[in-house]
Protein backbone atom coordinates (compact mmCIF):
# COMPACT_ATOMS: atom_id res chain seq x y z
CA UNK A 1 0.00 0.00 0.00
CA UNK A 2 1.21 3.49 -0.85
CA UNK A 3 0.01 6.66 0.84
CA UNK A 4 0.62 10.30 0.02
CA UNK A 5 0.47 12.40 3.20
CA UNK A 6 -0.63 16.02 2.83
CA UNK A 7 0.72 18.19 5.63
CA UNK A 8 -1.23 20.74 7.68
CA UNK A 9 -1.64 23.84 5.44
CA UNK A 10 -0.17 26.23 8.03
CA UNK A 11 3.12 24.33 7.75
CA UNK A 12 3.40 25.20 4.06
CA UNK A 13 3.46 28.96 4.72
CA UNK A 14 6.46 28.74 7.06
CA UNK A 15 9.92 29.81 5.97
CA UNK A 16 11.83 27.07 4.09
CA UNK A 17 14.06 26.06 7.05
CA UNK A 18 11.11 25.86 9.47
CA UNK A 19 8.96 24.05 6.91
CA UNK A 20 11.64 21.42 6.33
CA UNK A 21 12.16 20.97 10.07
CA UNK A 22 8.45 20.47 10.68
CA UNK A 23 8.10 17.97 7.84
CA UNK A 24 11.17 16.02 8.96
CA UNK A 25 9.63 15.84 12.43
CA UNK A 26 6.36 14.62 10.95
CA UNK A 27 8.19 11.89 9.00
CA UNK A 28 9.93 10.80 12.19
CA UNK A 29 6.62 10.74 14.07
CA UNK A 30 4.95 8.62 11.38
CA UNK A 31 7.75 6.05 11.57
CA UNK A 32 7.44 5.96 15.37
CA UNK A 33 3.65 5.57 15.33
CA UNK A 34 3.66 2.78 12.73
CA UNK A 35 6.90 0.90 13.41
CA UNK A 36 5.28 -1.84 15.52
CA UNK A 37 2.97 -2.61 12.57
CA UNK A 38 5.74 -2.52 9.94
CA UNK A 39 9.39 -2.20 11.03
CA UNK A 40 10.37 -1.80 7.34
CA UNK A 41 7.99 1.10 6.68
CA UNK A 42 9.41 3.67 4.25
CA UNK A 43 8.65 7.38 4.72
CA UNK A 44 10.16 9.75 2.14
CA UNK A 45 9.79 13.37 1.02
CA UNK A 46 10.75 16.62 2.70
CA UNK A 47 8.88 19.53 1.13
CA UNK A 48 5.13 19.67 0.55
CA UNK A 49 4.08 16.11 1.32
CA UNK A 50 5.34 12.71 2.39
CA UNK A 51 5.11 9.30 0.76
CA UNK A 52 4.50 6.31 3.01
CA UNK A 53 5.01 2.83 1.60
CA UNK A 54 4.44 -0.49 3.33
CA UNK A 55 4.68 -4.12 2.25
CA UNK A 56 2.09 -5.13 4.86
CA UNK A 57 -0.90 -6.84 3.25
CA UNK A 58 -3.04 -8.01 6.16
CA UNK A 59 -6.29 -5.98 6.10
CA UNK A 60 -6.37 -5.66 9.89
CA UNK A 61 -2.88 -4.12 10.01
CA UNK A 62 -3.64 -1.81 7.09
CA UNK A 63 -6.81 -0.59 8.82
CA UNK A 64 -4.81 0.04 11.99
CA UNK A 65 -2.21 2.04 10.04
CA UNK A 66 -4.91 4.21 8.52
CA UNK A 67 -6.59 4.72 11.90
CA UNK A 68 -3.33 5.86 13.49
CA UNK A 69 -2.51 8.28 10.69
CA UNK A 70 -6.01 9.75 11.03
CA UNK A 71 -5.06 10.66 14.62
CA UNK A 72 -1.53 11.96 13.99
CA UNK A 73 -0.98 15.72 14.50
CA UNK A 74 0.60 17.44 11.50
CA UNK A 75 -1.41 15.60 8.85
CA UNK A 76 -4.27 17.37 7.06
CA UNK A 77 -5.27 14.31 5.04
CA UNK A 78 -3.68 11.44 3.16
CA UNK A 79 -4.42 9.55 -0.04
CA UNK A 80 -4.37 5.85 -0.81
CA UNK A 81 -2.84 5.71 -4.30
CA UNK A 82 -1.71 3.34 -7.04
CA UNK A 83 1.61 4.38 -8.56
CA UNK A 84 2.62 3.94 -12.21
CA UNK A 85 5.36 5.25 -14.51
CA UNK A 86 3.99 8.22 -16.43
CA UNK A 87 3.03 7.53 -20.05
CA UNK A 88 1.12 9.52 -22.63
CA UNK A 89 -2.51 10.62 -22.34
CA UNK A 90 -3.80 7.29 -23.62
CA UNK A 91 -1.78 5.44 -20.99
CA UNK A 92 -3.12 7.75 -18.27
CA UNK A 93 -6.63 7.02 -19.52
CA UNK A 94 -6.07 3.26 -19.32
CA UNK A 95 -4.78 3.47 -15.76
CA UNK A 96 -7.81 5.53 -14.71
CA UNK A 97 -10.19 3.12 -16.42
CA UNK A 98 -8.57 0.24 -14.56
CA UNK A 99 -9.58 1.74 -11.21
CA UNK A 100 -12.71 3.77 -11.97
CA UNK A 101 -14.55 2.07 -14.85
CA UNK A 102 -16.74 0.05 -12.49
CA UNK A 103 -17.87 3.15 -10.57
CA UNK A 104 -18.96 5.31 -13.53
CA UNK A 105 -21.97 3.66 -15.25
CA UNK A 106 -25.00 5.90 -14.75
CA UNK A 107 -23.06 8.38 -12.59
CA UNK A 108 -22.25 12.08 -12.89
CA UNK A 109 -18.48 12.43 -12.57
CA UNK A 110 -15.52 14.80 -12.75
CA UNK A 111 -11.80 14.33 -13.37
CA UNK A 112 -9.36 16.12 -11.05
CA UNK A 113 -5.67 16.26 -11.92
CA UNK A 114 -2.85 17.81 -9.89
CA UNK A 115 0.51 18.07 -11.62
CA UNK A 116 4.08 19.04 -10.70
CA UNK A 117 7.01 19.00 -13.11
CA UNK A 118 7.57 19.64 -16.81
CA UNK A 119 5.20 17.84 -19.19
CA UNK A 120 3.94 18.26 -22.77
CA UNK A 121 0.39 18.75 -21.45
CA UNK A 122 -1.38 20.83 -18.83
CA UNK A 123 -3.51 19.57 -15.96
CA UNK A 124 -6.64 20.86 -17.72
CA UNK A 125 -5.74 18.99 -20.91
CA UNK A 126 -5.42 15.76 -18.92
CA UNK A 127 -8.81 16.35 -17.28
CA UNK A 128 -10.54 17.10 -20.59
CA UNK A 129 -9.04 14.16 -22.48
CA UNK A 130 -9.51 11.57 -19.73
CA UNK A 131 -12.98 12.88 -18.85
CA UNK A 132 -14.19 12.84 -22.46
CA UNK A 133 -12.96 9.31 -23.06
CA UNK A 134 -14.35 7.96 -19.79
CA UNK A 135 -17.76 9.45 -20.58
CA UNK A 136 -17.82 7.77 -23.98
CA UNK A 137 -16.35 4.42 -22.93
CA UNK A 138 -17.70 3.77 -19.41
CA UNK A 139 -21.42 4.59 -19.62
CA UNK A 140 -21.31 7.65 -17.38
CA UNK A 141 -24.46 9.77 -17.19
CA UNK A 142 -22.56 13.02 -17.57
CA UNK A 143 -19.98 15.41 -16.22
CA UNK A 144 -20.34 18.00 -13.45
CA UNK A 145 -17.37 19.89 -12.11
CA UNK A 146 -19.36 21.42 -9.25
CA UNK A 147 -21.39 18.46 -7.93
CA UNK A 148 -20.05 15.12 -9.20
CA UNK A 149 -21.18 11.81 -7.75
CA UNK A 150 -17.78 10.28 -8.52
CA UNK A 151 -14.40 12.03 -8.65
CA UNK A 152 -11.67 10.49 -10.79
CA UNK A 153 -8.56 11.82 -9.06
CA UNK A 154 -4.92 11.61 -10.01
CA UNK A 155 -1.62 13.31 -9.28
CA UNK A 156 1.29 13.59 -11.71
CA UNK A 157 4.76 14.25 -10.32
CA UNK A 158 7.60 14.42 -12.78
CA UNK A 159 7.53 10.98 -14.42
CA UNK A 160 5.20 9.29 -11.94
CA UNK A 161 1.43 8.88 -12.05
CA UNK A 162 -0.62 8.38 -8.89
CA UNK A 163 -4.23 7.28 -9.30
CA UNK A 164 -6.09 8.12 -6.10
CA UNK A 165 -8.13 5.33 -4.55
CA UNK A 166 -9.39 6.96 -1.36
CA UNK A 167 -8.82 10.03 0.83
CA UNK A 168 -8.69 9.98 4.64
CA UNK A 169 -8.92 13.14 6.74
CA UNK A 170 -6.64 13.57 9.74
CA UNK A 171 -6.64 16.06 12.62
CA UNK A 172 -4.28 18.76 11.29
CA UNK A 173 -2.07 20.80 13.58
CA UNK A 174 1.70 20.76 13.87
CA UNK A 175 3.84 17.65 14.40
CA UNK A 176 4.42 16.75 18.02
CA UNK A 177 8.01 17.53 18.94
CA UNK A 178 8.22 20.58 16.68
CA UNK A 179 6.65 23.00 19.20
CA UNK A 180 6.86 23.58 22.94
CA UNK A 181 5.64 21.45 25.85
CA UNK A 182 2.63 21.94 28.13
CA UNK A 183 1.33 20.44 31.37
CA UNK A 184 -2.41 19.82 31.47
CA UNK A 185 -4.24 19.70 34.80
CA UNK A 186 -6.30 16.52 34.44
CA UNK A 187 -9.43 15.58 36.34
CA UNK A 188 -10.51 13.00 33.76
CA UNK A 189 -13.82 14.74 33.03
CA UNK A 190 -15.13 16.12 29.76
CA UNK A 191 -13.36 19.47 29.99
CA UNK A 192 -9.81 18.47 30.88
CA UNK A 193 -9.69 15.59 28.39
CA UNK A 194 -10.93 17.78 25.54
CA UNK A 195 -8.49 20.55 26.53
CA UNK A 196 -5.65 18.00 26.45
CA UNK A 197 -6.76 16.81 23.02
CA UNK A 198 -6.89 20.38 21.71
CA UNK A 199 -3.30 21.09 22.72
CA UNK A 200 -2.08 17.74 21.40
CA UNK A 201 -3.92 18.30 18.14
CA UNK A 202 -2.31 21.71 17.74
CA UNK A 203 1.10 20.08 18.10
CA UNK A 204 2.07 20.81 21.72
CA UNK A 205 3.65 17.95 23.65
CA UNK A 206 1.18 17.51 26.51
CA UNK A 207 2.18 16.04 29.87
CA UNK A 208 -0.50 15.11 32.41
CA UNK A 209 -0.80 16.33 36.01
CA UNK A 210 -3.40 14.86 38.37
CA UNK A 211 -4.14 16.22 41.83
CA UNK A 212 -5.33 13.30 43.94
CA UNK A 213 -7.92 14.56 46.40
CA UNK A 214 -8.19 11.18 48.11
CA UNK A 215 -9.76 8.71 45.71
CA UNK A 216 -7.68 5.76 44.44
CA UNK A 217 -10.39 4.82 41.95
CA UNK A 218 -10.31 8.37 40.56
CA UNK A 219 -6.53 8.22 40.13
CA UNK A 220 -6.80 4.94 38.22
CA UNK A 221 -9.54 6.39 36.03
CA UNK A 222 -7.44 9.45 35.16
CA UNK A 223 -4.43 7.24 34.44
CA UNK A 224 -6.61 5.27 32.08
CA UNK A 225 -7.98 8.21 30.09
CA UNK A 226 -4.57 9.95 30.00
CA UNK A 227 -3.01 6.79 28.60
CA UNK A 228 -5.83 6.54 26.05
CA UNK A 229 -5.29 10.12 24.86
CA UNK A 230 -1.53 9.63 24.59
CA UNK A 231 -1.80 6.30 22.83
CA UNK A 232 -4.38 7.54 20.31
CA UNK A 233 -3.12 11.05 19.58
CA UNK A 234 0.37 11.48 21.00
CA UNK A 235 2.32 8.21 21.05
CA UNK A 236 5.04 9.58 18.77
CA UNK A 237 6.50 11.33 21.85
CA UNK A 238 7.06 10.11 25.39
CA UNK A 239 5.38 12.27 28.02
CA UNK A 240 4.91 12.06 31.78
CA UNK A 241 2.00 11.38 34.09
CA UNK A 242 2.39 13.29 37.36
CA UNK A 243 0.26 12.47 40.40
CA UNK A 244 0.35 14.96 43.29
CA UNK A 245 -1.21 13.82 46.60
CA UNK A 246 -3.53 16.65 47.62
CA UNK A 247 -5.41 15.06 50.53
CA UNK A 248 -3.58 17.12 53.17
CA UNK A 249 -4.00 20.28 51.12
CA UNK A 250 -7.76 19.68 51.00
CA UNK A 251 -7.84 19.01 54.73
CA UNK A 252 -6.00 22.25 55.45
CA UNK A 253 -8.40 24.21 53.24
CA UNK A 254 -11.42 22.65 54.96
CA UNK A 255 -10.04 23.50 58.38
CA UNK A 256 -8.59 26.96 57.79
CA UNK A 257 -10.38 28.68 54.88
CA UNK A 258 -13.77 30.38 54.82
CA UNK A 259 -16.34 28.24 53.04
CA UNK A 260 -17.10 30.73 50.27
CA UNK A 261 -13.42 31.04 49.27
CA UNK A 262 -12.52 27.33 49.23
CA UNK A 263 -12.96 26.67 45.51
CA UNK A 264 -10.82 29.61 44.38
CA UNK A 265 -8.07 28.85 46.89
CA UNK A 266 -7.98 25.17 45.91
CA UNK A 267 -7.50 26.18 42.27
CA UNK A 268 -4.72 28.59 43.28
CA UNK A 269 -2.96 25.81 45.20
CA UNK A 270 -3.22 23.56 42.16
CA UNK A 271 -1.73 26.24 39.92
CA UNK A 272 1.12 26.81 42.38
CA UNK A 273 1.89 23.10 42.50
CA UNK A 274 1.56 22.66 38.74
CA UNK A 275 3.90 25.60 38.19
CA UNK A 276 6.56 23.96 40.35
CA UNK A 277 6.18 20.68 38.47
CA UNK A 278 6.37 22.47 35.12
CA UNK A 279 9.47 24.42 36.12
CA UNK A 280 11.13 21.21 37.26
CA UNK A 281 10.41 19.60 33.88
CA UNK A 282 11.24 22.75 31.86
CA UNK A 283 7.69 22.94 30.52
CA UNK A 284 6.55 26.24 29.04
CA UNK A 285 2.84 26.53 29.93
CA UNK A 286 -0.04 25.09 31.94
CA UNK A 287 -3.34 23.95 30.41
CA UNK A 288 -6.74 23.76 32.10
CA UNK A 289 -10.21 22.84 30.88
CA UNK A 290 -11.97 25.90 32.28
CA UNK A 291 -14.72 27.69 30.34
CA UNK A 292 -16.18 31.07 31.21
CA UNK A 293 -18.78 30.82 34.03
CA UNK A 294 -19.35 27.10 33.61
CA UNK A 295 -18.99 26.80 37.41
CA UNK A 296 -18.62 29.41 40.13
CA UNK A 297 -14.82 29.39 40.17
CA UNK A 298 -14.71 30.14 36.43
CA UNK A 299 -16.15 33.66 36.37
CA UNK A 300 -13.81 36.27 34.94
CA UNK A 301 -13.06 37.86 38.36
CA UNK A 302 -12.31 34.44 39.85
CA UNK A 303 -10.13 33.33 36.94
CA UNK A 304 -8.15 36.55 37.25
CA UNK A 305 -7.53 35.93 40.95
CA UNK A 306 -6.69 32.27 40.31
CA UNK A 307 -4.16 33.17 37.60
CA UNK A 308 -2.40 35.62 39.91
CA UNK A 309 -1.08 32.60 41.85
CA UNK A 310 1.44 31.90 39.08
CA UNK A 311 3.66 33.79 36.68
CA UNK A 312 3.48 30.93 34.18
CA UNK A 313 1.30 31.15 31.09
CA UNK A 314 -2.05 29.37 31.59
CA UNK A 315 -3.74 28.17 28.40
CA UNK A 316 -7.50 27.56 28.39
CA UNK A 317 -8.42 26.02 25.01
CA UNK A 318 -12.11 25.77 25.97
CA UNK A 319 -12.53 29.23 27.46
CA UNK A 320 -15.39 30.28 25.10
CA UNK A 321 -16.79 26.79 24.42
CA UNK A 322 -20.33 25.68 25.24
CA UNK A 323 -20.70 22.58 27.40
CA UNK A 324 -22.59 20.64 24.75
CA UNK A 325 -19.88 21.39 22.21
CA UNK A 326 -17.30 20.06 24.67
CA UNK A 327 -19.33 16.89 25.23
CA UNK A 328 -19.73 16.43 21.47
CA UNK A 329 -15.97 16.73 21.00
CA UNK A 330 -15.34 14.25 23.83
CA UNK A 331 -17.70 11.82 22.12
CA UNK A 332 -15.90 12.24 18.81
CA UNK A 333 -12.41 11.71 20.23
CA UNK A 334 -13.41 8.79 22.44
CA UNK A 335 -13.15 10.25 25.96
CA UNK A 336 -16.87 10.76 26.68
CA UNK A 337 -17.45 7.31 28.17
CA UNK A 338 -14.38 7.70 30.37
CA UNK A 339 -15.72 11.04 31.62
CA UNK A 340 -19.28 9.83 32.21
CA UNK A 341 -18.09 6.98 34.41
CA UNK A 342 -15.10 8.66 36.03
CA UNK A 343 -15.04 7.97 39.79
CA UNK A 344 -15.07 11.28 41.61
CA UNK A 345 -13.91 12.54 44.96
CA UNK A 346 -15.01 16.00 45.97
CA UNK A 347 -13.34 17.15 49.17
CA UNK A 348 -14.00 20.88 48.84
CA UNK A 349 -17.66 21.83 48.60
CA UNK A 350 -18.62 25.45 49.08
CA UNK A 351 -22.22 26.00 50.09
CA UNK A 352 -22.20 29.59 48.82
CA UNK A 353 -19.08 29.90 46.63
CA UNK A 354 -18.01 33.38 45.68
CA UNK A 355 -18.31 34.43 42.06
CA UNK A 356 -16.36 37.68 42.56
CA UNK A 357 -13.26 36.81 44.54
CA UNK A 358 -11.23 39.77 45.83
CA UNK A 359 -7.47 39.55 45.94
CA UNK A 360 -7.22 41.07 49.44
CA UNK A 361 -9.73 38.56 50.83
CA UNK A 362 -7.94 35.64 49.16
CA UNK A 363 -4.59 36.83 50.51
CA UNK A 364 -6.07 36.97 54.01
CA UNK A 365 -7.49 33.44 53.78
CA UNK A 366 -4.24 32.05 52.39
CA UNK A 367 -2.29 33.48 55.31
CA UNK A 368 -4.19 30.97 57.47
CA UNK A 369 -2.94 28.12 55.24
CA UNK A 370 0.23 26.24 56.23
CA UNK A 371 2.29 26.31 53.02
CA UNK A 372 4.52 23.54 54.37
CA UNK A 373 1.66 21.17 53.55
CA UNK A 374 1.84 22.19 49.89
CA UNK A 375 5.61 21.63 49.96
CA UNK A 376 5.10 18.12 51.37
CA UNK A 377 2.63 17.33 48.60
CA UNK A 378 5.17 18.40 45.98
CA UNK A 379 7.89 16.31 47.61
CA UNK A 380 5.61 13.27 47.35
CA UNK A 381 4.60 13.92 43.74
CA UNK A 382 5.06 10.83 41.62
CA UNK A 383 6.29 11.12 38.02
CA UNK A 384 6.09 8.21 35.61
CA UNK A 385 6.35 7.93 31.81
CA UNK A 386 2.81 7.61 30.47
CA UNK A 387 3.63 4.33 28.71
CA UNK A 388 4.60 2.83 32.08
CA UNK A 389 1.60 3.82 34.20
CA UNK A 390 0.50 0.20 34.34
CA UNK A 391 3.85 -0.92 35.77
CA UNK A 392 3.62 1.77 38.45
CA UNK A 393 0.34 0.66 39.99
CA UNK A 394 2.15 -0.95 42.88
CA UNK A 395 4.12 -4.10 43.49
CA UNK A 396 1.94 -5.17 46.39
CA UNK A 397 -0.71 -6.47 43.99
CA UNK A 398 0.26 -8.93 41.28
CA UNK A 399 -1.97 -8.91 38.21
CA UNK A 400 -1.77 -12.34 36.61
CA UNK A 401 -1.94 -12.63 32.83
CA UNK A 402 -3.02 -15.76 30.97
CA UNK A 403 -2.55 -16.62 27.30
CA UNK A 404 -5.36 -19.15 27.08
CA UNK A 405 -8.86 -19.28 28.54
CA UNK A 406 -9.91 -22.57 30.12
CA UNK A 407 -13.29 -24.25 30.24
CA UNK A 408 -15.40 -22.80 33.04
CA UNK A 409 -13.70 -19.41 32.96
CA UNK A 410 -15.60 -16.36 31.68
CA UNK A 411 -13.90 -13.82 29.45
CA UNK A 412 -15.18 -10.28 30.04
CA UNK A 413 -14.67 -8.18 26.92
CA UNK A 414 -14.33 -4.70 28.43
CA UNK A 415 -13.77 -2.82 25.17
CA UNK A 416 -16.05 -0.01 24.04
CA UNK A 417 -19.29 -1.41 22.52
CA UNK A 418 -18.34 -0.01 19.09
CA UNK A 419 -15.02 -1.91 19.19
CA UNK A 420 -16.84 -5.09 20.21
CA UNK A 421 -19.26 -4.66 17.31
CA UNK A 422 -16.44 -4.05 14.82
CA UNK A 423 -14.38 -7.04 15.96
CA UNK A 424 -16.28 -9.42 18.27
CA UNK A 425 -14.18 -11.77 20.39
CA UNK A 426 -15.07 -15.38 19.63
CA UNK A 427 -13.50 -18.24 21.61
CA UNK A 428 -14.81 -21.75 20.86
CA UNK A 429 -16.03 -23.45 24.02
CA UNK A 430 -15.47 -20.35 26.19
CA UNK A 431 -18.17 -18.01 27.47
CA UNK A 432 -17.50 -14.42 26.40
CA UNK A 433 -19.51 -11.54 27.87
CA UNK A 434 -19.38 -7.91 26.79
CA UNK A 435 -19.08 -5.64 29.83
CA UNK A 436 -17.75 -2.16 28.90
CA UNK A 437 -14.87 -0.80 30.97
CA UNK A 438 -16.96 2.13 32.16
CA UNK A 439 -19.55 -0.18 33.74
CA UNK A 440 -17.17 -2.86 35.03
CA UNK A 441 -16.43 -1.56 38.53
CA UNK A 442 -20.09 -1.00 39.38
CA UNK A 443 -21.43 -4.24 37.88
CA UNK A 444 -18.65 -6.66 38.80
CA UNK A 445 -20.06 -7.17 42.31
CA UNK A 446 -23.27 -8.48 40.69
CA UNK A 447 -21.40 -11.35 39.02
CA UNK A 448 -21.12 -14.87 40.47
CA UNK A 449 -18.18 -14.70 42.89
CA UNK A 450 -17.52 -18.43 42.45
CA UNK A 451 -16.50 -18.03 38.80
CA UNK A 452 -13.13 -17.00 37.38
CA UNK A 453 -13.13 -13.89 35.17
CA UNK A 454 -10.56 -12.94 32.54
CA UNK A 455 -10.56 -9.29 31.46
CA UNK A 456 -9.85 -8.61 27.80
CA UNK A 457 -9.07 -5.49 25.76
CA UNK A 458 -7.05 -4.89 22.59
CA UNK A 459 -3.85 -3.53 24.14
CA UNK A 460 -4.07 -5.02 27.63
CA UNK A 461 -3.91 -1.56 29.22
CA UNK A 462 -7.48 -1.08 30.41
CA UNK A 463 -7.75 -4.74 31.40
CA UNK A 464 -4.69 -4.46 33.67
CA UNK A 465 -5.87 -1.19 35.20
CA UNK A 466 -9.27 -2.62 36.05
CA UNK A 467 -7.88 -5.97 37.20
CA UNK A 468 -5.56 -4.10 39.56
CA UNK A 469 -8.46 -2.07 40.93
CA UNK A 470 -10.71 -5.11 41.40
CA UNK A 471 -7.93 -7.08 43.10
CA UNK A 472 -7.23 -4.16 45.43
CA UNK A 473 -10.94 -4.19 46.36
CA UNK A 474 -10.69 -7.84 47.39
CA UNK A 475 -11.94 -9.62 44.25
CA UNK A 476 -9.45 -12.48 43.93
CA UNK A 477 -11.19 -14.14 40.97
CA UNK A 478 -9.79 -11.76 38.32
CA UNK A 479 -7.04 -12.22 35.76
CA UNK A 480 -6.08 -10.58 32.47
CA UNK A 481 -6.57 -12.42 29.19
CA UNK A 482 -3.74 -11.69 26.72
CA UNK A 483 -3.98 -14.19 23.84
CA UNK A 484 -0.72 -14.98 22.07
Curated annotation (Swiss-Prot):
Residues annotated for ATP binding in this entry: 185-186, 267, 289, 298
Active-site residues (renumbered): 457 (cysteine persulfide intermediate)
This protein's name: tRNA sulfurtransferase
Taxonomic source organism: Azotobacter vinelandii (strain DJ / ATCC BAA-1303)
GO biological process: thiamine biosynthetic process; thiamine diphosphate biosynthetic process; thiazole biosynthetic process; tRNA 4-thiouridine biosynthesis
Disulphides: 346-457
Pathway it works in: Cofactor biosynthesis; thiamine diphosphate biosynthesis
Phylogenetic placement of the source organism: Bacteria, Pseudomonadati, Pseudomonadota, Gammaproteobacteria, Pseudomonadales
Chief place where the protein resides: cytoplasm
EC nos: 2.8.1.4
PROSITE patterns hit by this protein: RHODANESE_3 (PS50206), THUMP (PS51165)
Domain Rhodanese positions: 405-483
GO CC entries: cytosol
Top-rank EC class of the record's enzyme: transferase
Domain THUMP: 63-167
GO molecular function terms noted in the UniProt entry: ATP binding; CCA tRNA nucleotidyltransferase activity; tRNA binding; tRNA-uracil-4 sulfurtransferase activity
Keyword annotations from UniProtKB, A to Z: ATP-binding, Cytoplasm, Disulfide bond, Nucleotide-binding, Redox-active center, RNA-binding, Thiamine biosynthesis, Transferase, tRNA-binding
Amino acid sequence: MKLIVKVFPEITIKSPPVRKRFIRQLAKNIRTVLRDLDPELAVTGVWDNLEVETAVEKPRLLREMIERLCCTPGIAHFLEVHEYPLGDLDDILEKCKRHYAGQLPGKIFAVRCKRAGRHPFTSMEVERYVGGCLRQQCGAAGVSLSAPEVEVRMEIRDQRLFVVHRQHDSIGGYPLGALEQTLVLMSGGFDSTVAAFQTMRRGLMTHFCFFNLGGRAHELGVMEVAHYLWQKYGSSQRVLFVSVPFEEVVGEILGKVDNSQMGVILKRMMLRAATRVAERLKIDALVTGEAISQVSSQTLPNLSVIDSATDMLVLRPLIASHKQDIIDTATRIGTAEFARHMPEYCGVISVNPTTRARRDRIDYEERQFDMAILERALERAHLVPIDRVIDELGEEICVEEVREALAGQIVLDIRHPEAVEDGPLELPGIEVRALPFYALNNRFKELDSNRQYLLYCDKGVMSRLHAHHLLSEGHANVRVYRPA
